[in-house]
Amino acid sequence: MAILINKKTKVICQGFTGSQGTFHSEQAIAYGTNMVGGVTPGKGGHTHLNLPVYNTVHEAKAKTGANASVIYVPPGFAADSILEAIDAKIEVVVCITEGIPVLDMIKVKRALIGSKTRLIGPNCPGVITPGECKIGIMPGHIHKIGDIGIVSRSGTLTYEAVAQTTAAGLGQSTCVGIGGDPVNGTSFVDCIEMFLQDDETKAIIMIGEIGGSAEEDAADFIKQSKIKKPIVSFIAGITAPADKRMGHAGAIISGGKGSAEDKVEVLQSAGVIITRSPADIGKTMLDLLNKI
């Protein structure tokens, strides 16, 4: 079953004919993703990568039945692209773009309320259900069909968790990069809830980082959840020096809250197993499952 996407998901690409849209659409098609077309305003009626190009998301959905979209659009235009997909009632929208202005994302966040759209990102690697559907920039070959659900604020650390669970023979059910920006569409809580309810997901890896309260919110949810599954977490930034700017816009410790140690403590109190090194994520999960 997995979560969010599967082999039946029909995907369009916004920013389809640009360099990034072209390259990553080629990779998705090669992986087996059911790409059905793309959107580039002004280029409707043409074909690209042997797929139809449309001027609008509305037209693309009407002609192809698409229920998912991936956005490779520059930061100044990305929010409008998300809003267009929301207006077209696309079910899953994955925005890869980094650097979208916060005020633009606040407008998007408001538009998501009561909509039919689930936004993944922005500033994220995307989402993949191994062997079925790849939407985003992650390397497909490191994934393996399995039963570990992975959710992460960091793209490259997601790949570490994937490579290690693949090497351990565990594989993944679905991997979701929720993005590193302060305002995003889908949270740890959203993904953990879906993984807990998914019969194909036996355990969960959650990769967090300093800044914000997403990990604390997840810990509260895990405590209160009636469904229990093994969860391993790594929090990036434990050794981050004070007053130093880090990589993600959301990696800001403010008001004495959002530190890595605070997050570790609250997650441990919820029964989550913490690994202190990203190199031990796969081993920690394998050891935990062997004890059950």
From Swiss-Prot:
Cited SUPFAM superfamilies: NAD(P)-binding Rossmann-fold domains, Succinyl-CoA synthetase domains
Homology family: Belongs to the succinate/malate CoA ligase alpha subunit family.
Any one cellular-component term (Gene Ontology): succinate-CoA ligase complex (ADP-forming)
Stretches that traverse the bilayer: none
Entry protein name: Succinate--CoA ligase [ADP-forming] subunit alpha
EC number from the UniProt entry: 6.2.1.5
Sites where the protein binds CoA: T17, G18, S19, Q20, K43, I96, T97, E98
Subunit structure: Heterotetramer of two alpha and two beta subunits.
PROSITE patterns: SUCCINYL_COA_LIG_1 (PS01216), SUCCINYL_COA_LIG_2 (PS00399)
Binding site for substrate: Y159
InterPro entries (UniProt xref): Cit_synth/succinyl-CoA_lig_AS, Citrt_syn/SCS-alpha_CS, CoA-bd, CoA_lig_alpha, NAD(P)-bd_dom_sf, SUCC_ACL_C, Succinyl-CoA_synth-like
Alphabetical keyword list: Ligase, Nucleotide-binding, Tricarboxylic acid cycle
